[in-house]
Regions:
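Beta/alpha (TIM)-barrel catalytic core signal, keyed to glycine-rich beta->alpha loops juxtaposed to Asp/Glu
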Residues: 2-26, 59, 78, 88, ...
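Hydrophobic residues in well-ordered beta-strands that form the structural core
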Residues: 71-72, 107, 211, 289
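Catalytic domains of carbohydrate-active enzymes, especially glycoside hydrolases
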Residues: 57-78
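N-terminal small/glycine-rich loop or linker at the start of catalytic domains
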Residues: 29-48, 107-141, 170-178, 294-301
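Glycine-centered flexible beta-alpha turn that most often forms the glycine-rich phosphate-binding loop
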Residues: 40, 70, 166, 209
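Active-site mouth loops of central-metabolism enzymes
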Residues: 41-54, 134-151, 179-186, 305-315
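Structural motif
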Residues: 61, 65, 161, 328-329
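Glycine-rich loop at the start of a catalytic domain that most often binds anionic cofactors/ligands
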Residues: 79-95
Length: 366
């Protein structure tokens, strides 16, 4: 097991020692970390050894080049995503390229991480006397947020990653259950999960937790899939009692084609309705972008003036799209999946390019 967790001193040290190839603006301070404005994702690809090797090498090359935020999930490639991160961490740490304390490692739980899905869930959890989990706890055949399930999945993620502490642990797309269970039941389930995660933070298994969503924070309050961020934060505060809660992160898609988190008012905070990222900032919650380049789809459809303004000599539209997302005001980091060495090298070129400032960004989308 790799001991330790991301620390303020060591993540700042990571940023400082990469200043020869990276601009200081490539890094941001949030939640007692200094982390890169680009994070490496591990979502796409088949669950085989060839992809494992590519993902492992992509992580190693990214960390060597100035990216110290790594994002995965237990269901990514049926647990191979996390196991590829472990292989990369072992190589990086054994070679003394980096220390564990310099890296911000994030994972998620909630989806079924096995090909057999319902059969596996029934065998491992419903028919297992170790757990008090019912068939009704599995929603849409793919998702469970029963506290015992999440606790067990967190333990499995720690084993897959080979680490003592996950820096940020997300409940993965809980809005999957909305529209199937009632809103009251949903927030009740959320409260039970948060109780488990607060205890996990107390035990040093995680540093912070959050919710990773696809729709939840971007859709309007009238939508069945809407998650109320203020209410969610209040639940965490209630569970934490007098001490500060550890619900400190959200993850949501942000890219040139999906701007709702930036421009669409969907979240009420202190009587005002705000876009999700603005609301998160006001509530003291850090926002991370997923799908930062929309998996490079449909980039040709965007106005040439936007792509030109983002270009700054960037060679490819996908780089311009990533530059756009990591420049969103109030956003901590933009995730991008990487496997090919060429894509890693291309994305690393952005670490020597400053993000747009708030005024430039506002002019771009205005």
């Amino acid at each position: 097991m790799i001991l330790g967790k991301a620390t303020a001193i060591k993540t700042k040290y990571y940023a400082e020692r990469h200043q020869t190839e990276c601009l200081l603006e490539n890094f941001r301070e949030f939640n007692n970390f200094t982390a890169s404005s680009i994070g490496i994702g591990t979502y796409l690809g088949s669950s085989d050894s060839a992809i494992d090797d590519l993902v492992t090498e992509a992580i190693i090359k990214s960390v060597k080049g100035g990216i110290n935020l790594i994002d995965t999930a237990i269901n990514y490639r049926y647990q191979h995503g996390e196991m590829s991160v472990k292989k990369a961490l072992l190589k990086l740490i054994e070679s003394k390229t980096v220390s564990r304390e310099e890296l911000v490692i994030c994972s998620k739980g909630g989806f079924i991480p096995n090909r057999e899905r319902e059969e596996w869930f029934k065998r491992e959890y419903i028919n297992n006397s170790k757990f008090n989990i019912q068939g009704t706890d599995l929603v849409a055949g793919v998702h469970c947020m029963h506290p015992e399930y999440i606790q067990d999945q967190l333990e499995q993620s720690l084993m897959n990653l080979g680490i003592e502490t996950i820096d940020v642990y997300y409940l993965h797309n809980p809005e999957t259950q909305l529209g199937i269970i009632s809103t009251d039941e949903f927030y009740g389930r959320l409260k039970a999960v948060f109780s488990v995660l607060e205890k996990a933070a107390d035990a040093g298994k995680i540093t912070a937790y959050g919710i990773a969503t696809w729709q939840g924070f971007r859709v309007p309050p009238t939508d069945a899939k809407h998650i109320d961020l203020s209410k969610t934060k209040s639940i965490a505060q209630e569970i934490a009692g007098g001490k500060g809660d550890r619900f400190q992160f959200i993850q949501l898609p942000v890219n040139l084609a999906m701007l709702e988190a930036v421009v669409s008012p969907t979240q009420f905070v202190d009587g005002k309705i705000l876009p999700a990222i603005t609301a998160a900032n006001k509530l003291g919650v850090n926002a991370i972008a997923s799908a930062s380049i929309a998996q490079a789809k449909n980039l040709k459809q965007f106005p040439q003036k936007i792509m030109t303004a983002l270009g700054q000599g960037l060679k490819k539209d996908a780089l311009s799209a990533l530059q756009f997302t990591r420049s969103v005001p109030g956003l901590c980091s933009a995730l991008v999946g990487m496997k090919s060495p060429d894509h890693v090298a291309e994305n690393l070129t952005l670490t020597s390019v400053p993000p747009l400032d708030a005024a430039e960004f506002a002019e771009l989308i205005g």
